[in-house]
Amino acid sequence: MAVDLSEEIKQLDATLTGIETVLDVEGLRRRAEDLERQAADPDLWSDQDRAQAVTRRLSSTRGDIARVEGLRRRLDDIAAAADLGDEDLLAEAAADLPRLSSDIAGLEVRTLLSGEYDERDAIVQLSAGAGGVDAADWTAMLLRMYLRWAERHGYATEVFDTSEAEEAGLKSATFQVKAPYAYGTLRSEHGVHRLVRISPFDNQNRRQTSFAGVEVTPVVELSDHVDIDDKDLRIDIFRSSGPGGQGVNTTDSAVRITHLPTGIVVTCQNERSQLQNKAAAMIVLQAKLLERRRAEEAAEKQRITGGPQDVSFGSQIRNYVLHPYQMVKDLRTDTETSNTSGVLDGELDDFIDAEIRWRRSVENQA
């Protein structure tokens, strides 16, 4: 008996057509042509920051076009198979539909990322909270989780700094995710993450609760006008260290930068040279200063308009329970799964996509 796929194909076609309208594919093609002209200008590379911004936007725009065109081709192929009525082709098309539907849904989420900085790379900082050695171990687990998530998507990452705890785990870690819409995607992870498990560090095998904070900021571009006066900086050079303060470098190449007006401190010790560490630390400092400015502007807007405070900022957003049962649950969207090992190995897309949809619905109601 032939499978009738007409209704599913019709629904997917309507969804994809809506996505093409929102993304304005023809507009994307014009944008790509303009960026290609800019990238071909030999003078562009005299300004490395601008050149990198242009090439990043070009890569992102080409990626959007390729995703839409690829999905449209796949849907057209399935529709053509359905029209032919061949049972073997229909069976193959029916098997392909769930994956195509999932991919279209993923692109639909991408259309919701329209914030001013959503297109940027992301700086992610992890910090151990309450919970002692378990919190430090939890911070290390989160670092691995996010790096695995990026690896699954083929995204480049760069770890700028890790501060190891005395017994195990990490006090903090800072890394960059280099991918189109990395900030818009990962900003859903900003907040406090709570772990419940039997502590491997407790001789009595008691259940322990530990916390770690995740802070996500966009990478700064020249257009953001985040100007830093050299006289506002204190730069300390020191030797990179490993667990227990043991030196792992034979030269003083690690860099700590303190922004005196705000008290913001950033550190980088994972690069090979002092100059590379300083450059990486400045990237993080600029991102933090931009985020501080945005927070101040948002607070002033709320004061003027009398709008509600953002209670989700810095608050507990997700529970990871490994004992007495297995469950990861997001407290904002109620998305949950018992596949804790998968989540900790980077399977975060269901949580991230649900939060992006939830965030947009909240913004639309405001």
UniProtKB/Swiss-Prot annotation:
One of its GO terms (molecular function) is translation release factor activity, codon specific. GO terms for cellular component: cytoplasm. SUPFAM superfamilies: Release factor. It holds the Pfam family PCRF. It is found in: Cytoplasm. The keyword Lyase does not apply. The modification N5-methylglutamine is found at residue 246. Keywords: Cytoplasm, Methylation, Protein biosynthesis. Methylated by PrmC. Methylation increases the termination efficiency of RF2. Peptide chain release factor 2 directs the termination of translation in response to the peptide chain termination codons UGA and UAA. PANTHER family: CLASS I PEPTIDE CHAIN RELEASE FACTOR, PEPTIDE CHAIN RELEASE FACTOR 2. Belongs to the prokaryotic/mitochondrial release factor family. This is Peptide chain release factor 2. It comes from Frankia casuarinae (strain DSM 45818 / CECT 9043 / HFP020203 / CcI3).
